[in-house]
């Protein structure tokens, strides 16, 4: 991972949606994640320009993409689009991509924001980034201290 120990890896996570893409950043050493930004998903050119700028700024070692699934684990309408997005990230930027089951991430994100009294426009504006944080935190929480990351 680009000269960085896997245990100290910086990760960017994405909650891919048709209209917006939530982005979070985290670190494997501290096992912490935070919501970063929401990218309007206007078109392919805009999407990858914005992602490229984030990658240049944060220099992550790997990427995590939420994989939408129905509650019973079957593929969702957005499953294939999220997979394609992750594959495009890998192809364009050459970074490893891990997919994480994102069932209930938006529900958990909204509940967490409500708990912190984030209201109105602020909650709407950051919900997708908070969902990306939840996805990344799930990934970080499942990392074993004994396996390479």
From Swiss-Prot:
The keyword Hydrolase applies. It is an enzyme of class 3 (hydrolase). GO terms for biological process: rRNA 5'-end processing. GO terms for cellular component: cytosol. Gene3D superfamilies: YqgF/RNase H-like domain (3.30.420.140). Its EC number is 3.1.-.-. It is found in: Cytoplasm. The keyword Disulfide bond does not apply. Keywords: Cytoplasm, Hydrolase, Nuclease, Ribosome biogenesis. It holds the Pfam family RuvX. One of its GO terms (molecular function) is nuclease activity. InterPro entries: RNaseH-like_sf, YqgF, YqgF/RNaseH-like_dom, YqgF/RNaseH-like_dom_sf. Could be a nuclease involved in processing of the 5'-end of pre-16S rRNA. Belongs to the YqgF nuclease family. This is Putative pre-16S rRNA nuclease. It comes from Burkholderia multivorans (strain ATCC 17616 / 249).
């Amino acid at each position: 991972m680009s000269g960085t120990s896997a245990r100290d890896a910086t990760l960017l996570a994405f909650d891919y949606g048709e209209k917006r893409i939530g982005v979070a950043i985290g670190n494997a050493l501290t096992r912490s994640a935070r919501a970063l930004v929401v990218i309007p998903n206007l078109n392919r050119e805009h999407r990858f320009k914005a992602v490229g700028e984030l990658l240049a700024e944060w220099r992550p070692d790997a990427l995590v993409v939420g994989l939408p699934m129905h509650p019973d684990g079957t593929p969702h309408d957005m499953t294939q689009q999220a997979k394609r997005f992750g594959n495009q990230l890998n192809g364009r930027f050459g970074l490893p991509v891990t997919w994480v089951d994102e069932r209930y991430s938006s529900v958990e994100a909204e509940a967490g924001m409500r708990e912190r009294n984030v209201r109105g426009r602020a909650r709407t504006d950051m919900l997708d980034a908070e969902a990306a944080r939840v996805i990344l935190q799930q990934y970080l929480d499942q990392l074993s201290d004994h396996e390479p990351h």
